[in-house]
């Protein structure tokens, strides 16, 4: 089509001029040359191997040169998400799109997703993650190859269960502190995400980073807000064609704002690392645990597909183990000449874990509170479970043993993560051609494959009544009958979230403390939610709740 248009343009230009080509005006010559170049490029693109290989994959209508890149022009993050979901509903579980010459293939079938996530063939993160490079460097989220494998191996043990148990009192202290701060909002509607965001930053600083004295004033909230703004900027760069080009982006006001946000973010983490190195006393921070026999592992079954190195570390340790939390472990490794670890590695991983460990759980906890505010019957069941655990002393500190009894609260958290996964998609670059399991499609090497957790979690063939908030979706008997890649809020396989157990424990302690202190109300319904996915799934119109103080009888 594009070739025919150019031919017609050339014929019109030739017939309207009695001069030779040498007589064309410079403007006309430039126009004709540009059109010819564009036509040749489009002809080459449509005859390329990758274009022909994916010709049978459904897609929205595309424009020459641009593909579907024009679709995002002028739209907000919430509008982009809505349009994208609309296309997926129309074109089915597998869809392709072109951002210029960049091929994207979207997957929502668990059998296809298993091919991407379960093995070691397609571990390379997509090109779209390069916009995180100034922030995360070569941290776990975006690194590849030997560097990623080495860092994963060294960092995973810092999230061992014995370390997590030691964090519970700190989780409790910060949960009680945010309960007190939120008391000032009691009786009125407010955005709870602001409180969750600051609290999760403080918890990370006090636990994984080992900070003794938290930043004064609103520094934690300032950092959290800078992270939100930086995610918005990176998302714009990923979906807006012109912002993808460094040569254009560097001259924009968006880049100026990004520089300001990065100064705030790196200023905080640099200070954290500097403080920890200056005050590092390894023996006072170490946890020594004697394990005589390994923890009994789950019998091999199809659920084995979702196991990862975190399970192996927890279950197979024997003997005396000396453990350090994340930043302390990295400081010690950097001092050891026999370990491949340096100062840049420390900064890269601190920036990565600070982002992954706070923004995701602040969104998850905020969504959970909103859902309990909307579904009062479910909140009542959560409270009843808390009553059964805490008895007549409902305001005592939570323990690790208590969290193990919170089966219904855990199901509420999992159901929240099903409907509103904080990370709504995963992007990988194929290292080999891939034949999909769900249909007659072969995706070529080099393609950016996007796994859409948000859509997988709402498939009606997997979750009957998929938009209903139903914690019983995570009863063991229901889970046993589902494909094990049909629920992947923490990803799965070798590149699963290294902090998933940390996140679940933190969410249990935080939500338990809030629910035991307050009745959560919401004037919004799920129909009022305006979802936006700027890296992390959030609500454009805020996580609005109100709180009512619970009253307990005092013992005379």
Swiss-Prot record:
The keyword Ribonucleoprotein does not apply. Its cofactor is heme. Keywords: Endoplasmic reticulum, Heme, Iron, Membrane, Metal-binding, Microsome, Monooxygenase, Oxidoreductase. It comes from the Eukaryota. GO terms for cellular component: endoplasmic reticulum membrane. One of its GO terms (molecular function) is iron ion binding. The keyword Secreted does not apply. Heme binds at residues 356, 497. InterPro entries: Cyt_P450, Cyt_P450_CS, Cyt_P450_E_grp-I, Cyt_P450_sf, Cytochrome_P450_Monoox. It is an enzyme of class 1 (oxidoreductase). SUPFAM superfamilies: Cytochrome P450 (SSF48264). It is a peripheral membrane protein. Signal peptide: none annotated. It is found in: Endoplasmic reticulum membrane; Microsome membrane. GO terms for biological process: cuticle hydrocarbon biosynthetic process. Belongs to the cytochrome P450 family. May be involved in the metabolism of insect hormones and in the breakdown of synthetic insecticides. This is Cytochrome P450 4g1. It comes from Drosophila melanogaster. The gene is Cyp4g1.
